[in-house]
């Protein structure tokens, strides 16, 4: 934050965005406990910059086609010893904020996973997430220098150079979708980005294998991760998690971009 010496920064909270003026203020309000807020703005044309400035954030502007590259730029922009990585649709609760402060003062490890409570609209949907369609936890708290994102457009792979610590007990609130239409749009966006990665690497795979994954992922999310407990939303989560690989595969085979 302005006026604070760089050496005093223990914790940086960082988010990377593209035109998130509708959600950014609420996100930043929930990370105001950090010593530094960093906002990486990817080709933003809305009012996001003014919002970030209001919170005294360190702002990095640029253009990134690869999600992993953008996230790595965000990490590099942080001055803190520890980094808390959040998305614009995520809110850090007061209990989680207090736990994070305690962990960074006492942890002998290099990174920790954070549990996630996902919301569709105003409804909390806790069960069924995973298999590249949603997250139940993520490695969001880490020392600078131990986490590197891979060069993928969607769901970049991670490379670690440090020791994993215990999972945090409190959860971040993730307002992932407003409703079913958002869920469908997200599946379309994810599969398009994944198809581009597959074409570039030549790793398109076989139709038969991706059909098999449709069923295995559905069973994993609906039965193994108890999506059945969430009613219709749980059914859709499992269905979309299963469809994601086969739709990505077909797009990679049939479409140029």
Q: Where do the protein language model's features map onto the residues?
A:
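Short, Lys/Arg-enriched N-terminal segments with co-localized hydrophobic residues
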Residues: 1-6
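Short, structured coil segments at secondary-structure junctions
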Residues: 33, 54-56, 161
